[in-house]
Design a protein with these regions (language model features):
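N-terminal pre-domain/capping segments
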Residues: 1-107, 140, 178
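Conserved beta-strand positions
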Residues: 5, 47-49, 112, 158-160, ...
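Active-site acidic/histidine proton-transfer and metal-coordination neighborhood
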Residues: 63-64, 68-76, 80-182
Length: 189
């Protein structure tokens, strides 16, 4: 078994994305390369990253990140959102953009927060009439992105996160029915 860490776990070190309306008041302790060095010191096998951790998403920088991870023997996973505008828009990508970044850093996983908007708190709103059209749009995006993901060798994983029910994620997966479109069930949220 490999042990990785989501950079949000180092939020108090200035790493990871802003979340829940909280914006960091201090600079990150490490850049992406220092973070990888720290991961090795901690005995980790890999990191689950966002664009906030990468610092930049231009191709030259992403190649440097990939090379640095390979030199350190670390796996990388890429985490992005379809619409993180409410808390940290640095994380917002189309599925195709997220797949391209994941491929560039050598990640075989692109974990996606779907960012479903609900008319009221999550409790009792599974498959709410205002949610179903959003799920359908995500399914269409995933249908289009599936072949792109397969060509890139990146499995995309739709996450339930804090705003989707597992049944809703499975509904999308069953509609898409593509070997490179899967699920990340977050049992902590």
């Amino acid at each position: 078994m490999l042990l990785g860490l989501h950079t949000y776990s180092l939020h108090l070190h200035g790493m990871g994305q802003n979340w829940g309306g909280f914006k960091l008041r201090w600079e990150p302790v490490w850049d992406i390369f220092g973070l990888m060095d720290e991961a090795k010191k901690l005995g980790l096998d890999g990191l689950h990253l966002t664009a906030a951790d990468l610092g930049a998403t231009d191709q030259e920088h992403l190649r440097d990140v990939r090379r640095a991870a390979e030199e350190r023997g670390l796996f990388l996973e890429y985490n992005f959102s379809l619409d993180a505008s409410e808390y940290d828009d640095r994380l917002t990508h189309t599925m195709e953009e997220g797949i391209a970044i994941a491929e560039s850093i050598g990640s075989d996983i692109g974990k996606i927060s779907m960012d479903v908007r609900r008319p009221h708190p999550v409790c009792g709103s599974a498959f709410h009439p205002e949610v179903i059209p959003q799920l359908e749009k995500i399914a269409v995006k995933a249908l289009t992105a599936g072949p792109v993901a397969q060509n890139a060798g990146v499995r995309i994983c739709l996450e339930n996160h804090t705003e989707a029910f597992s049944d809703e994620v499975l509904w999308i997966i069953n509609r898409v029915n593509h070997p490179y479109v899967g699920v990340c069930v977050d049992t902590n949220n």
